[in-house]
């Protein structure tokens, strides 16, 4: 999409997840392409593009799942258990809504740190976007960890999370141009074609074309 906008060179910048929006607004980069979940709170500090993908949550535990964790409710009901989560991730809010005590949450800067927390015993589980953490686990392949295949999705008002690119509020011109290119891909049905090689599916992850970022930011679809 950026090439279609005449942008030939893109320089990537690494950042802790919790520093993405602060870094964006500080001018360290021009857009966030991490599939960040659109939330009403984040909408106050950043200009999201239209939704690109929808997804559920996933859980990774110590091999053998010794604490028998299959849901956020299981973590809440086992007060001795701890869960590692990236700082600033929406999963923290989901966990709290499901009854997990804040003291049970180990905040970490990124996915490798969350895996390390579980492998070292500082946490019993880690959670994040289902396909993201599953793919990360498959690529790192640590014997100490396993993906919970029968994880029960949290009941967060019946809505999945919706991810999108994020732009500075004062750079809506780039956001609007990006949205135009995104709309073309949606109309041509190419989103599934682009995401399926990464393990996503049209059935589970392609967004309803009528869904808008405005409706998520307002809370209507959040």
Which functions belong to the PLM regions below?
Residues 10-22, 70, 106-120:
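Short helix-initiation/N-cap motifs at beta->coil->alpha
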Residues 35-44, 93-97, 124-159:
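A ligand-binding cleft/hinge motif common to bilobed small-molecule-binding domains
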Residues 53-58, 141-179, 202-222:
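Periplasmic-binding protein-like
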Residues 7-9, 26-34, 80-82, 119-132, ...:
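Alpha-to-beta junction loops
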Residues 8, 90-103, 145-146, 177-222:
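Ligand-binding clefts/hinges and TM-proximal coupling segments of bilobed small-molecule sensing domains
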Residues 50, 63-82:
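Flexible hinge/capping segments at coil-to-helix
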Residues 1-8, 89-109, 115, 137-142:
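Ligand-binding cleft/hinge of the Venus flytrap
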Residues 1-35, 44:
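Extracytoplasmic small-molecule ligand-binding "clamshell" domains
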